[in-house]
Amino acid sequence: YSDIVIEPMNAKGNAMQVYNYAEDFLKKEENASKYLYYEKHLVFDCDAPENIQQVITLMKDSGNDYILDYSNLLFETWLVMHFQNLEPEKDNSKRTIIKLMRDYLKVTKYTNKIKASKGTIGKILGSNGNEKIRAAIENAKLLEKHWEDKGKDMDRDITQMNPAVDIYKLIERLLDEIVYLCG
């Protein structure tokens, strides 16, 4: 039996804005009581603000038991992992990740319009979406092991951990629930 309820709320901004939005939302008594027993996931990328490590500390120390689902450096890092393994020893700068997206999508510019387009994720996943998602999850696990072996931890070392994604845990859980419910 599964009881997953997803209620996405868009904070429209960087990690600090996501945190502030969640804190303000949960300060309201009606929201605090309604979501008391819910898992509260904060989904963000780590390219902004510059003090991302301090923001992560605030999130962890808030008392609202947030689960942090991040993509470092960009959300596109996670998307690229669906069609290519990323390695920490290589160039994983914003410029490189955006170029990989541009090349894969066969566009001359990777604009906000393309980024927000409903078809973009479909183009990345193609007809074998489940395989690509599972491959991205495995890539994320390899990166996680790499950083663990180096003694790095998101709570204190996120700025040194590029690329790294933790959102895979939420995605994997959702996929497993779908498989469980659908057989």
Indicate residue ranges for each PLM-predicted region.
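C-terminal accessory helical subdomains adjacent to catalytic cores in phosphodiester-
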Residues: 2-9, 23, 28-183
